[in-house]
Regions:
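Beta/alpha (TIM)-barrel catalytic core signal, keyed to glycine-rich beta->alpha loops juxtaposed to Asp/Glu
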Residues: 12, 67-191
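Glycine-centered flexible beta-alpha turn that most often forms the glycine-rich phosphate-binding loop
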Residues: 4, 59, 91
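N-terminal binding-site loop/beta-alpha segment at the start of enzyme catalytic domains
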Residues: 1-27
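Short amphipathic alpha-helices and their capping/turn segments at secondary-structure boundaries
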Residues: 17, 47-52, 130-133
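Active-site-proximal beta-strand/loop segments in catalytic clefts of secreted hydrolases
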Residues: 7-10, 32-33, 147
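CE4/NodB-like, metal-dependent polysaccharide N-deacetylase domain
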Residues: 43-63, 81-85, 107
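A short, structured active-site edge motif that brings together acidic residues
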Residues: 26-38, 61-65, 118-120
Length: 191
């Protein structure tokens, strides 16, 4: 699977759209609405702008980028309608903590939240203590961003040595450990 992650904030959706145009059906396309645009009407308009810039009829996963001033009820209602209209396949959130997630899933339509995209890597593991178990108990996958710590982990002497011993790259070890840790936490929470 090929995943391309963008957002209206990144100001690169047109470029991404051009890049995936010839292989759109083979790409899982993720985009995000800015919190300042996350009112009911604003979310729908932001999605329309993203679809236009991306040159696609649908977005595979559309996320609320982080919490803002607009009530979650409005954003969830807009996301649910966008999904029903076929403009997005799935919707979720990004950078939400456990309290935010509890609030979101308690709303009408909130159970449709597919994921929370959060910072997670060998150097940033705080979610293992609350958010990861919470999501695992609900069988909601987490989506890690910066899984190799923006590259800063790739030169850590321990990671380099483990990678050398297994004849793989430090990035492969970092991704494997992130994945194994996520699976371990999901498995232990389901017992």
């Amino acid at each position: 699977m090929n995943l391309v992650d963008t957002a209206e904030m990144y100001d690169n959706e047109e470029l991404v759209g051009e890049a995936v145009h010839d292989c759109r059906e083979k790409v899982l396309l993720v985009s995000k609405v800015l919190p300042s645009n996350a009112s009911y009407r604003g979310t729908k308009l932001a999605c329309e702008r993203s679809l236009l810039k991306l040159g696609t009829e649908y977005i595979d996963l559309y996320l609320l980028h982080w919490k803002g001033r607009h009530p979650y009820e409005e954003t969830v209602r807009a996301m649910t309608e966008l999904q029903q209209e076929g403009k997005i396949r799935l919707w979720g959130v990004s950078n939400m903590d456990t309290a935010d997630m509890e609030r979101i899933v308690s709303l009408s339509g909130g159970s449709g939240c597919a994921t929370d995209q959060v910072l997670y890597n060998l150097g940033d593991r705080g979610i293992e203590f609350d958010l990861m178990p919470w999501c695992a108990a609900r069988r909601m996958p987490l989506m890690a961003y910066s899984p190799i710590g923006e590259g800063r982990l790739l030169h850590h002497h321990t990671l380099v040595e483990i990678a050398r011993r297994h004849d793989v790259s430090p990035a492969q070890i970092a991704l494997f450990v992130d994945d194994a840790s996520a699976r371990y936490h999901c498995h232990t929470q389901s017992r």
